[in-house]
Amino acid sequence: MKNHELLCRLALTQLPGIGIAGAHKLLDATEGKVAMLFDHPKDLGDIIPGISPKIASVFDAPEVLRRCEAELSFAEKNHIACLTCDDEAYPSRLRECDDAPLVLFYRGISDLNQRHIISMVGTRNATDYGKDICMRFIGELKELLPDVIIVSGLAYGIDIHAHRAALQHKMETIGVLAHGLDRIYPSVHRRTAAEMTQCGGLLTEFMSGTNPDKQNFVKRNRIVAGISDATIVIESANKGGSLITAEIAESYHRDCFAFPGRINDMLSLIHI
């Protein structure tokens, strides 16, 4: 893909009032040539008949384009791959989802289309029971599927223990982030994240400078669910991000599993 088209697709994700559904509609309407919308903003009524003036007006966006140019320069300097949804390296499982990101930023060595990919999620307040499950299950999984990639969200609790268990068993593991690749949140996981770029990778749809705000974690969860064959919940209370991920996985018609919990354990109240 030419750099200008990549730039414009990234800019499309940053425009106000478009959203992911609208972005996909515009991508289809232009047959994958989003650049024409930015190159000829005053002619959008001819390019896409029926487009509302309000939507058309946001494509006159030089500041957005400048910011996205800076982001692509940042990516190049930091060995970050920018993947659009029609790139061969873009996760094919995720591409099947209606709300798949138009652009992903990826730093790592793992094939995002590996034959077997499993997502593991759970509470941020992991118990010894949950930590033990992570270590034992991932070890047994390696014996069954030596090429499997473990995906999680690099958060406290089950997420980080799943990543570390995979690394300990010399397996590839990918962390999906709720912010840009200019930082690691939480910062105490930087060392693990650095290891993962050499044995797995870090993946996000967010540009650098993006804060790890609450709504970004929900968006992150759909990538965790969509990139894998199945999602496994280790520990979770009645509510939480891991259950949101499980619900998203089911909406994508992906397999979803949960480990049985201990009686009267508040972190074992899930029913899938």
Annotated model-derived regions:
Residues 1-143:
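Short, positively charged patches
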Residues 1-3, 84-270:
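Glycine-biased, small-residue-rich flexible motifs in mid-sequence functional cores and linkers
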